[in-house]
C-alpha cells in the first residue's frame, strides 16, 4: 500500500476515534511538506475543525500523536500553525521502493475485459498534399493520448478519418490531367503524397493567374475591385472544370473514379511512410468517401423524426437556438453534404463498428465551435457518448519564420522535418557517440534516429496542447535543459552504470531490507518515483501529454542532481551502493515507461 494511502486510512481512523465522527476521505488532505519545514508529507487540518471543535494546532497535535502510535509509516511529526508535518519512517521508504521495483509497469493500470472502450481520432489528413508540421503535432498528441488512456486502464482504438473527396481533391486531379504528362511517383522519384501536393500547388498558381486576368477585365467593365475579385474566383475556367469533375465523381463516372483511386493510392503509400517514420499508427481508418452518404441518410432520418428542419430552398438545418447557438446547415439546397454531415456519418459507422464508451477528437482549436455543435447533434441523434464527446483542442505550431500555407507551396513538410532532425541529431551527438566502444555506423544511425525523433516529439509534447507554440529545431536538440535528448542521455547514463555494476558481479536483490540506508536525497527520489502513478492518473483526467513530459524532466533533473552529489558505484558502503543502484535502476525504468507514453524511445547507450 502506498504511503499516502496508509496515512489517509490511519487519519480517518484517528478522526473517528478521537472525535467520534466518520468523515469522508476527501477531508484528509495531504501535500508535500514545504522545504523549509521538517517532514515529508503534511496533513492540512483545517477541513477537520468542524469535526474536532478544536483549534488547528490542537487538532494537528491530536492526530499527530495518534499516527505516530498507530501508523507504521509515520516515524515522527511536528505542528506548524495547524499544518501537521509528518516524518515518514525508514521502513516505509524502503517498502515503497520495493513495491516500485516489483512492478515493471509501475504507475499504470491493467486493461481488463470490463475496461471502458475509448476511441481516439487523430491525423485526419487531406489526400491532396503531404503531412506538414501541424499534422506532426496532431499525430504526436493523438498517439501519446492513446498510450496515456491505455495506461489508465482503458481499452483504446486509434482511428483516422481521411478526407479523400471534395473540391480540393479534384483540384490536384485536374492539374495532373492538364500538366502531369502521365507522371507517376516512380517516374518522378518522389513520394506519392509529395507529387500530388505539387499538383495542388500548380492548380493554385494557374487559378490565380486566371483570376488576375478576369478581375482586370471585370474592373474595366465597371465593377469594384472586391466585386471583380469575387466574380473572377467563381467564373475562372479552372474552378468550373474542378466543380464539373466533382459532379462526375459524385455520379460515379468510371474514368474520374479510376483517376481518383490511382492518385489517392499514391498518397496513401506516402502517408504510410510518414506515419512509420513518426512511429504512429491506427487500428482503424475511415474514409470520408464512405461516410458522407451515411451522414446524409442519418440527417434525412433526423428530418423525418422532426429533429431538423427543411427550408423553402430545400436545404436542411439544425435549429440550435435553444442551446444558445445559431442554426447549422446540414444539407445544401442541392442535397450535397457539408463537413458536419460527414462527421455524423463517420460517427454512425464507428458506433456500428465498436461499442464506444468515450470518443475523443484530436483536432485544432479553430474547430472548437464545430465540435460544440457536433456534440449536440450526436446527442439528439441518440449516440450515448454524443453529449460527452471530448474535443481535444490544440493550438497552432509554427517555426521561427512564420506560418504555413500549403496552397503556396511553403508548407513545413513533415518528412523533411523528421529527416533534418535526424541529421542534426547525428551531428550534435557525434562527440558523445564516437566515444562508445565498438560502435558501428548502423548503431550511430539508430541512435541519431532515436535522439532526433525524441527531440522533435518531446519539444512538441512538453507544451500544453491548448497553447500555440513555436517549434525551434535547434533548441530541441540540446543535451541540457528541458529537452528529449537530456532525458534520453540520462537514461543511457544510468544503463551504463548498471552495466558496469553487472561487470563487477554486483547482483541487486529483489527487495531491500527495512533498515537499508537512505539519506534525504534518496528519499526524495523514491517519492518522485512514486509520483509517477499520480502523474499518469492526472494526465488521463486532463488529457495531458505535457504532464507526463514535465514529470519525466523533473525526475531526470532530480536524479542528475543526486548523481552529482553522490557516487553510486563508489559509495562508502556496500549497503549504500546496493540502495543507490536499486534507485537508479527504477529511475531508468520509470523514465523509459514515461517516455513510451509520449511515443519516445530511449537508447541503451549514447
Predicted regions and their residues:
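Flexible, low-complexity linker/hinge segments
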Residues: 101-113
Amino acid at each position: 500500500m502506498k504511503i499516502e494511502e496508509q496515512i489517509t486510512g490511519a487519519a480517518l481512523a484517528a478522526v473517528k476515534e478521537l472525535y467520534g465522527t466518520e468523515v469522508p476521505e476527501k477531508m484528509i488532505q495531504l501535500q508535500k511538506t514545504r522545504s523549509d519545514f521538517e517532514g515529508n508529507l503534511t496533513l492540512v487540518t483545517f477541513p477537520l475543525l468542524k469535526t474536532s471543535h478544536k483549534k488547528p494546532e490542537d487538532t494537528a497535535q491530536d492526530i499527530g500523536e495518534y499516527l505516530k502510535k498507530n501508523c507504521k509509516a509515520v516515524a515522527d511529526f511536528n505542528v506548524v500553525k495547524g499544518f501537521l508535518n509528518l516524518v515518514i519512517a525508514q521502513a516505509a521508504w524502503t517498502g515503497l521502493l520495493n513495491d516500485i521495483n516489483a512492478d515493471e509497469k509501475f504507475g499504470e493500470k491493467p486493461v481488463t475485459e470490463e475496461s471502458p472502450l475509448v476511441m481516439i481520432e487523430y491525423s485526419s489528413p487531406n489526400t491532396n498534399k503531404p503531412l506538414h508540421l501541424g499534422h506532426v503535432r496532431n499525430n504526436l498528441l493523438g498517439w501519446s493520448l492513446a498510450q496515456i488512456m491505455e495506461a489508465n486502464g482503458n481499452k483504446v482504438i486509434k482511428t483516422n478519418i481521411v478526407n479523400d473527396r471534395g473540391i480540393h481533391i479534384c483540384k490536384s486531379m485536374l492539374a495532373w490531367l492538364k500538366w502531369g504528362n502521365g507522371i507517376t511517383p516512380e517516374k518522378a522519384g518522389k513520394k506519392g503524397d509529395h507529387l500530388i501536393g505539387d499538383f495542388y500547388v500548380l492548380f493554385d498558381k494557374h487559378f490565380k493567374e486566371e483570376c488576375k486576368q478576369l478581375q482586370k477585365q471585370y474592373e474595366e467593365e465597371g465593377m469594384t475591385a472586391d466585386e471583380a475579385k469575387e466574380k473572377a474566383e467563381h467564373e475562372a475556367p479552372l474552378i468550373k472544370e474542378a466543380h464539373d469533375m466533382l459532379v462526375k465523381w459524385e455520379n460515379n463516372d468510371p474514368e474520374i473514379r479510376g483517376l481518383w483511386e490511382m492518385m489517392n493510392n499514391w498518397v496513401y503509400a506516402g502517408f504510410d511512410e510518414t506515419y512509420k517514420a513518426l512511429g504512429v499508427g491506427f487500428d482503424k481508418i475511415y474514409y470520408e468517401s464512405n461516410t458522407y452518404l451515411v451522414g446524409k441518410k442519418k440527417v434525412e432520418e433526423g428530418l423525418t423524426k422532426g429533429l431538423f428542419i427543411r427550408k423553402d430552398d430545400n436545404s436542411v438545418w439544425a435549429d440550435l437556438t435553444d442551446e444558445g447557438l445559431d442554426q447549422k446547415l446540414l444539407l445544401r439546397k442541392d442535397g450535397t453534404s457539408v463537413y458536419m454531415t460527414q462527421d455524423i456519418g463517420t460517427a454512425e459507422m464507428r458506433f456500428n463498428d465498436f461499442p464506444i464508451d468515450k470518443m475523443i477528437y484530436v483536432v485544432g482549436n479553430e474547430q472548437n465551435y464545430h465540435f460544440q455543435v457536433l456534440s449536440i447533434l450526436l446527442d439528439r441523434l441518440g449516440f450515448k457518448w454524443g453529449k460527452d464527446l471530448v474535443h481535444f483542442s490544440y493550438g497552432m505550431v509554427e517555426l521561427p519564420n512564420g506560418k504555413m500555407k500549403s496552397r503556396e507551396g511553403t508548407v513545413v513538410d513533415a518528412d523533411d522535418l523528421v529527416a533534418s532532425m535526424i541529421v542534426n541529431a547525428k551531428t550534435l551527438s557525434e562527440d558523445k557517440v564516437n566515444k562508445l566502444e565498438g560502435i558501428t555506423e548502423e548503431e550511430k544511425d539508430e541512435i541519431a534516429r532515436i535522439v532526433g525523433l525524441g527531440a522533435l516529439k518531446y519539444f512538441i509534447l512538453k507544451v500544453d496542447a491548448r497553447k500555440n507554440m513555436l517549434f525551434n529545431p535547434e533548441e530541441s536538440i540540446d543535451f541540457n535543459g528541458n529537452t528529449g535528448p537530456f532525458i534520453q542521455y540520462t537514461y543511457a547514463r544510468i544503463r551504463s552504470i548498471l552495466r558496469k555494476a553487472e561487470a563487477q558481479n554486483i547482483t541487486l536483490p529483489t527487495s531491500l531490507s527495512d533498515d537499508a540506508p537512505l539519506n534525504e536525497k534518496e528519499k526524495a527520489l523514491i517519492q518522485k518515483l512514486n509520483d509517477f502513478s499520480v502523474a499518469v492518473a492526472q494526465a488521463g483526467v486532463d488529457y495531458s501529454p505535457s504532464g507526463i513530459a514535465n514529470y519525466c524532466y523533473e525526475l531526470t533533473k532530480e536524479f542528475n542532481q543526486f548523481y552529482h552529489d553522490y557516487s553510486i558505484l563508489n559509495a562508502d558502503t556496500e549497503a549504500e551502493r546496493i540502495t543507490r543502484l536499486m534507485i537508479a535502476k527504477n529511475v531508468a525504468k520509470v523514465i523509459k515507461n514515461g517516455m513510451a507514453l509520449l511515443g519516445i524511445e530511449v537508447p541503451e547507450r549514447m
